[in-house]
Design a protein with these regions (language model features):
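An acidic-aromatic substrate-binding cleft motif
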Residues: 81-133, 138
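The substrate-binding groove and active-site-proximal loops of carbohydrate-active enzymes
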Residues: 107-111, 136-143, 163, 170, ...
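Core catalytic region of metal-dependent phosphoesterases/phosphodiesterases
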Residues: 62, 117-176
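Extended active-site neighborhood of metal-dependent phosphoesterases/phosphodiesterases
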Residues: 71-89, 147-245, 279-280, 302-324, ...
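Loop/turn elements at helix/coil->beta-strand transitions in domains of secreted/extracellular proteins
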Residues: 100-103, 125-130, 158-164, 197-202, ...
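Active-site-proximal segments of metal-dependent phosphoesterases and phosphodiesterases across multiple
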Residues: 224, 245-291
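Active-site neighborhood of phospho(di)ester-bond hydrolases with catalytic His/Asp-centered motifs
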Residues: 105-109, 129-135, 161-169, 255-259, ...
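Acidic, histidine-bearing metal-coordination/catalytic regions of metal-dependent phosphoesterases
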Residues: 1-105, 342, 347-358
């Protein structure tokens, strides 16, 4: 009945629970004694495929369990729709706790090879939450391209721990790119947002593409300049409301997640948005993150403030953590404790190539 286990994405003060269904059905999720429907504007969704239901983060954290419920449809008609049976499956959920060391795993740049991400995670070992940092598919000509990110997250978490998602530039390429919004977590329809997991506060930014909107590669299909400006305004809003955001009670660590490491120097083709990205870097001095967590470069790097590779001054290290090679995929383990963050660069071939405190 279910194609995979669910994925529980953290967005703001909510969880977005995504799962695939094999048959037309009405879906809901039960947490404690409360049910949440897969419903839009009063109409229950019924098509098979990806489904997404939002539940309050505080409620699921408290209950530690949720149940996915499907009413399987035999006839979806104008008058007298019929369902044949109800299928339920329950999942234990482990929220991120404050205080104790927290282990996170960041993957990205799989470009369609899901199993390499899974193998790299085994090298790192168990973790408390997952970061999926873009370019899990190479292109998005069809909606099944979005299954790579979902399948990796489902296999690594089994619906039992939180996931943070950042869109990569390759998710913007192809005829299906405009349909991704039914397959990923959003905040009010947007791919940038904040999250709070235990004592860790995070901001997800979305650089969009890696070249200018006018580039011939896109053929007029993108408008990311305005989209980036909107994120500048969003960062300013967070700074104005700092006591309810990154300076909220109990916050011990802050991270910014962005597929593209916008602070890093690039070659001429990829050097875009100087004004906007300089402003983002400046605003980060007010947010004071412990790290910028990125992918995109297909390599490993910890770029500290003052590095000759830095395009702009930065208040924190940039961790570029998804090495992509013919024989293996690299990913990053992160261990948050009171002394900082330990970065482990791990590979799908079982090797750990670096462990460094930042």
């Amino acid at each position: 009945m279910f194609s995979t286990d669910p994925v529980v994405y953290c967005v703001g003060d909510e969880y977005r629970i995504f799962f695939y269904t094999r048959f037309p059905s009405f879906a809901k999720i039960r947490v404690g004694g409360t049910e949440f429907d897969d419903c839009r504007c009063g109409i229950m969704r019924s098509a098979k495929g990806m489904r997404g239901i939002t539940v309050p983060k505080s409620l699921l954290d408290e209950c530690g369990e949720y149940t996915v419920c499907l009413d399987v449809i035999t006839a979806r008609v104008a008058y007298g729709t019929k369902t044949v049976k109800t299928v339920e499956k329950s999942y234990a959920f482990r929220p991120v706790k404050s205080g104790a060391p927290v282990r996170a795993f960041m993957t990205g740049d799989a470009h369609g090879n899901a199993q390499r991400s899974v193998k790299a995670a085994k090298t790192f070992g168990g973790f408390d939450f997952l970061i999926v940092n873009g370019d899990m598919s190479d292109k998005c000509e069809k909606t099944n391209s979005f299954e790579v990110a979902h399948n990796v997250a489902a296999e690594l978490t089994r619906g039992g721990i939180p996931v943070v998602y950042a869109r990569g530039n390759h998710e913007n390429r192809g005829a299906a790119a405009e349909l991704i919004y039914d397959y990923i977590p959003l905040r009010n329809g947007l791919t940038y947002y904040t999250f709070r997991l235990g004592s860790i506060w995070g901001l997800v930014l979305d650089c969009g593409e890696d070249k200018g909107d006018e580039h011939s590669e896109y053929g007029g299909s993108v408008r990311f300049h305005k989209f980036r400006k909107e994120q500048t305004a969003y960062m300013r809003e967070l700074i104005d409301d700092a006591q309810n955001a990154f300076a909220a009670p109990g916050v011990e660590h802050r991270v910014v997640v962005s597929h593209i490491p916008f602070i890093r120097d690039m070659n001429k083709t990829f050097t875009i948005e100087n004004e906007t990205y300089a402003e983002w870097a400046k605003l980060m001095f007010e947010i004071k993150p412990d790290a910028l967590l990125s992918a995109h470069m297909h390599t490993y790097e910890i770029m500290r403030p003052g590095s000759p590779h830095a395009r702009f001054p930065a208040p924190c290290p940039t961790v570029v953590g998804t090495e992509c090679r013919d024989g293996y995929l690299g990913a990053t383990g992160l261990i948050f404790d009171k002394k900082g963050i330990t970065v482990d660069f791990v590979r799908s071939d079982g090797k750990t190539v670096l462990s460094e405190k930042i």
